[in-house]
């Protein structure tokens, strides 16, 4: 983007900034520019899904902050298209690193995950289904029960593994598919969307609300290693119980299997985050259960 355009954006919103430069951490959806030391400019790619995501952010972030969630304040949102061909958003800058950049496992960052869980509880309990956020929906994933057979037919494994995975999903389906209360979800809880102070790892904020919407609260416990979930649940339950508390772990496990099988058919993704890699989540599920977790997790595992 020409520097003159960036300077015009800064001038329009009355910001006093120093150097302006493009961040090396640009994501799939947005180009990111650092406006001095205090602000971040997010400019979506010029395509309908990316533009829709930043519009969702513009209403989700104020609602989340009002509920007590730690997330950077929205300083400005401009959809006039007078300076850029797409809407854009300016946020306060969080000075830290993404948790994903630290390359630390859940066992090395338990307090971070507990804090994330607490913020999810505040989000789920504190945002009501009214006002600008009321119509926001998360992108649905297909029912995973057909995926094992599809993957077996494609040659990823054999009919034996398909029967095992199908049986596991059948065990969890009554819990996951029951009518459930709707809660406002972040929708994309990857380690790259968790901001931390690195040494020692200290939670700072959740970022990137473009996938937010209404649904089962348990689905916000996916996109991250399953080994992190017990820490998150501990932090969450210090604030509030989960909706339909007695089936929460079953629904979380269903969601992890759903995403893992959905991703498994992709080709390798060497430049993307952990949650976008085809086999990482399925291997993580196996790793979690090889660690002999206690109940209720042990009751939800279906041995081969």
Model-derived features with residue positions:
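An alpha-helical support segment within catalytic cores of ATP-dependent transferases
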Residues: 1-16, 82, 106-114, 121-187, ...
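Short, surface-exposed alpha-helical segments at coil->helix boundaries
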Residues: 3, 58, 230-233
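Alpha-helix C-terminal capping segments
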Residues: 10-13, 32-36, 64, 176, ...
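Short, surface-exposed acidic
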Residues: 16-20, 159-165, 242-251
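ATP-binding pocket architecture of kinase catalytic cores
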Residues: 20-138
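Active-site acidic catalytic loop and adjacent metal/ATP-binding pocket
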Residues: 28-36, 41, 74, 169-221
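Glycine-rich, phosphate-binding/catalytic loops in enzymes
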Residues: 57-58, 107-108, 202, 221-224, ...
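Helix-rich C-terminal or lid/interface subdomains of diverse kinases
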Residues: 99, 114-115, 178, 213-304
């Amino acid at each position: 983007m020409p520097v003159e355009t960036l300077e015009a954006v800064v001038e329009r919103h009355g910001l006093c900034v120093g150097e302006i430069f493009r961040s090396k951490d640009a994501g799939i959806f947005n180009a990111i520019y650092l406006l001095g030391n205090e602000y971040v400019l997010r400019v979506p790619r010029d395509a309908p899904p990316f533009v829709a995501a930043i519009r969702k952010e513009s209403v989700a972030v104020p609602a989340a902050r009002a509920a007590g969630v730690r997330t950077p304040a929205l300083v400005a949102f401009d959809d006039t298209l007078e300076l850029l061909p797409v809407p854009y958003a300016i946020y306060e800058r969080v000075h830290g690193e993404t948790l994903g950049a630290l390359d630390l496992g859940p066992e090395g960052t338990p307090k971070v995950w507990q804090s994330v869980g607490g913020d999810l509880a505040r989000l789920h309990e504190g945002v009501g289904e009214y006002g600008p956020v009321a119509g926001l929906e998360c992108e649905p994933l297909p029912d995973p029960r057909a995926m094992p057979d599809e993957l077996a037919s494609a040659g990823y494994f054999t009919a034996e593994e398909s029967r095992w995975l199908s049986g596991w999903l059948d065990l969890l389906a009554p819990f996951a598919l029951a009518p459930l209360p709707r809660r406002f979800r972040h929708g994309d809880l990857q380690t790259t969307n968790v901001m931390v102070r690195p040494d020692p790892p200290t939670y700072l904020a959740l970022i990137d609300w473009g996938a937010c919407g209404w649904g089962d609260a348990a689905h916000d416990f996916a996109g991250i290693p399953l080994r992190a979930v017990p820490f998150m649940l501990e932090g969450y339950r210090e604030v509030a119980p989960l909706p339909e508390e007695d089936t929460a772990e079953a629904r979380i496990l269903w969601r992890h299997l759903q995403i893992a099988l959905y991703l498994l058919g992709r080709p390798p993704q060497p430049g993307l985050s952990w949650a976008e890699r085809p086999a990482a989540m399925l291997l993580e599920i196996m790793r979690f259960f090889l660690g002999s977790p206690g109940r209720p997790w042990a009751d939800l595992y279906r041995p081969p």
